[in-house]
Amino acid sequence: MSKLQGTKTLQNLINAFAGESQARNRYTYYASIASKEGYKQIEEIFIDTANNEKEHAKLFFKKIAEYIDVTKDALVLPVTGSYPVALGDTLNNLKFAAAGEN
């Protein structure tokens, strides 16, 4: 049993991992829309941002794995949090992205 098992720290780490993971997907969707609308530079910014979110998620995931032995059994943890669901045209997606980073 890990020192983190059942702690608020572990819950915060898994929530952060989930948040960064879903943000990555959201930015990837936004990049696709920007591309379809002909905004190549904005598409690239969304892709870069998605890649940053992936790296953030990886840090949280690795930190969890440092403290919990996940090599033998999968650890299933509940995720608690609120995550935005917003998808529009590129202008609105830029606004959604800015609001989501505050």
Predicted regions, residues:
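Non-heme di-metal
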Residues: 1-102
